[in-house]
């Protein structure tokens, strides 16, 4: 993994998080980060005293770069990004207090002089952030976004125009592009989030904040797993990578005595999962915990939760930010083995083309296919 960012007479050591699970060809910043850093350095002569707001910094590169400028406000929905920022500030001998770190549920009320946005993969998240910005920007605020050129579509620019004002773009450089926007001082939008839909049989109303995976409908993998939920009455269950919490919610419906731990690395996902328990089964709220974590790191960090769980349900993602990877699923499976009791079960749904069966067999010594269709398989492994 390339770790040294050298640009404009500055040099920083930057790691992706978790560093030990990264491919040697990956790095903690991209050409869009570099383009944004260069543009600001060459076009805004004095950053001292400016209120800087930073959104969607994948692994803390922007946070580190601007950390010496008046404690910029740094907002991300990703717990992994939060951990990466803390790691990279420490590696570069910069106090965490140099950055005002907040999650995506934070509504900024301080006025911004300069807003820097990495365009997220989910346009709904971008839309929510642009709406939120209406309360903290003025026509004098400089708003600059950066992203891969092929990810900046007409629909991306239309969101800036719709919610803020006049929008233009730069030329492409190293396959990245900048977006420049000026707030017109007039637009005040009502957020369309959370989006809501009903589950088929139980008719639960599912609320989904902007960055929740499959926020408009039940995703196919979860649909398959819902038909094969275990009997979990009076057992402790982890809904790992819970998203809006639809699996854990149905566990509580099927097994009223279950205790469910909802875990996700998205702050919006955890907030949505809690909202969905509160709205659909409020009497079960005291049987639930909601934890923002990279896989099960936060559950296992103290060691006291090892071997305490009966069942882990898992619908693993195969992206980290914009990178396709299997390391998240691998860590989820390893963490699941640690947190499960003797004879506890890991139950996984995944695309059939993925190598989950052999990975699980290496860790648990065996696996069983509970069900499968043309696209998905449900795998079960018992901890011995």
UniProtKB/Swiss-Prot annotation:
Catalytic activity field: guanosine(1835) in 23S rRNA + S-adenosyl-L-methionine = N(2)-methylguanosine(1835) in 23S rRNA + S-adenosyl-L-homocysteine + H(+)
Domain of life, per lineage: Bacteria
tRNA processing found in the keyword field: no
Molecular function as annotated in GO: 23S rRNA (guanine(1835)-N(2))-methyltransferase activity; nucleic acid binding
Record key words, sorted: Cytoplasm, Methyltransferase, rRNA processing, S-adenosyl-L-methionine, Transferase
Localization annotation: Cytoplasm
UniProt key word Thylakoid: no
Cellular component aspect of the GO annotation: cytoplasm
Major localization listed first in the record, in broad terms: cytoplasm
InterPro entries: DNA_methylase_N6_adenine_CS, rRNA_m2G-MeTrfase_RlmG, RsmC/RlmG, SAM-dependent_MTases_sf, Small_mtfrase_dom
Enzyme nomenclature, EC number: 2.1.1.174
Family, as annotated: Belongs to the methyltransferase superfamily. RlmG family.
Job of this protein: Specifically methylates the guanine in position 1835 (m2G1835) of 23S rRNA.
Alphabetical list of HAMAP family matching this protein: 23SrRNA_methyltr_G
Protein name: Ribosomal RNA large subunit methyltransferase G
């Amino acid at each position: 993994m390339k770790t040294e960012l050298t640009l404009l007479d500055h040099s920083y050591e930057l790691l992706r998080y978790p560093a030990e699970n990264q491919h040697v060809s990956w790095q903690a910043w991209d050409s869009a980060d570099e383009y944004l850093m260069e543009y600001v350095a060459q076009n805004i002569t004095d950053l001292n005293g400016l209120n800087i707001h930073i959104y969607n910094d994948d692994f803390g590169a922007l946070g580190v770069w601007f950390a010496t400028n008046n404690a910029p406000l740094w907002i991300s929905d990703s717990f992994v990004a939060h951990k990466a920022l803390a790691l990279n500030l420490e590696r570069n001998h910069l106090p965490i207090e140099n950055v005002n770190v907040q999650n995506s549920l934070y509504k900024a009320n301080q006025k911004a002089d300069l807003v820097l946005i990495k365009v997220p993969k989910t346009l709904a998240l971008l839309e929510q952030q642009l709406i939120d910005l209406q309360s903290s920007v003025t026509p004098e605020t400089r708003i600059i976004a950066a992203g891969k050129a092929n990810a900046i579509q007409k629909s991306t620019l239309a969101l800036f125009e719709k919610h803020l004002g006049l929008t233009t773009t730069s030329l492409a450089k190293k396959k990245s592009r900048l977006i420049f926007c000026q707030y017109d001082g007039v637009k005040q939008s009502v957020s369309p989030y959370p989006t809501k839909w009903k589950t088929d049989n139980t008719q639960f109303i599912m609320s989904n904040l902007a960055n929740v995976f499959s926020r408009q409908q039940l995703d196919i993998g979860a649909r398959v797993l819902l038909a094969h939920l275990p009997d979990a009455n009076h057992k402790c269950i982890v809904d790992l990578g819970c998203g809006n919490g639809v699996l854990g919610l149905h566990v509580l419906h099927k097994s009223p005595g279950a205790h469910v731990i909802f875990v996700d690395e998205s702050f919006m996902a955890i907030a949505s999962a809690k909202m969905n328990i509160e709205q659909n089964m409020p009497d079960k709220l005291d049987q639930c915990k909601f934890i923002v974590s990279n896989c099960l790191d936060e559950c296992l960090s103290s060691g006291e939760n090892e071997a305490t769980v009966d069942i882990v349900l898992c619908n693993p993602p195969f992206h980290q930010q914009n990178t396709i990877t299997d390391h998240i699923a691998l860590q989820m499976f390893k963490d699941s083995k640690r947190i499960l009791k003797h004879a506890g079960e890991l139950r996984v749904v995944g695309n059939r083309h993925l190598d989950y069966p052999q990975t699980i067999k290496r860790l648990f010594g065996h696996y069983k296919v509970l069900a499968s269709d043309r696209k998905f398989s449900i795998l079960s492994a018992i901890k011995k």
